[in-house]
Amino acid sequence: MPVLEHRHDIRDDVVALTFDDGPSPWTEPMLDLLAAHEGHATFFALGCVADADGADETLRLILESGSEIGNHTFSHPSLPKLDDDSIRDELERAGSVIEEASGTTLRYWRPPFFHVDKRVRKVVSPLGLQEVGCSMMPWDWEWDAARSAAFVIERLQRGSIVCMHDGRPPNEPADLSAPTREASVAAVGMILDAMSRRGLRPVTISELLLAR
């Protein structure tokens, strides 16, 4: 299956919002913002986080809101650095944990750091998951809310896939000076307001694929 990064062939005024590295305490505020704008998103969850106490409740909230969940591997490694068995284990282990916790079947995956090559794709292909890239990704793990929002708003167009973050991966360096995901939440609020003014509707990857 080809990598999905943008849909250029549609007339519907939709944009797919995606969030990586959750679930986390910042996931529910993201869902509240989406609900206020009658929108949905796709949350690419980490298996190691989804396995934590209370994560199943957050995952179910995602689904109950009309949003959906994707596979972001178990431990957020750079997949090309792993052997074939380890790559497969990262996706299968995450899928098992997330599906058991959420009660849904996963259809999409996203490689950590967007690090992927032909070998990785060949290993993952039998799992039947659609790889999802993105049209744009602000450095919301480092930037303040205004900068992240401006980066996205300037580039938004029909069919875009926006990648942001509702959690922190286990291998992210601790930087006490960097914005927390609260900055990401604030940026999403600004982005959704701008989308509303421009008549753009936030949707899941599945909804983007169904757009005309």
Predicted features along the sequence, with ranges:
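Active-site beta->alpha N-cap acidic-glycine motif
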Residues: 1-78, 86, 90, 97, ...
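Glycine-enriched alpha-helix->loop->beta-strand junction motifs that scaffold or abut catalytic
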Residues: 37-40, 65-69, 123-132, 158
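C-terminal domain-boundary segment and adjacent tail
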Residues: 2-9, 37, 174-212
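Conserved, mostly hydrophobic/aromatic
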Residues: 20, 34, 69-72, 94, ...
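His/Asp/Glu-enriched short active-site or ligand-binding loop at hydrolase and phosphoryl-transfer sites
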Residues: 115, 119-156, 200-211
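A cross-domain feature marking catalytic cores of carbohydrate-active enzymes
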Residues: 19-21, 45-47, 71-73, 110-113, ...
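A short acidic, helix-capping loop that chelates divalent metal ions and anchors anionic groups
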Residues: 77-82, 170-175
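Generic structural signal for well-ordered alpha-helices
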Residues: 31, 56-60, 91-95, 121, ...
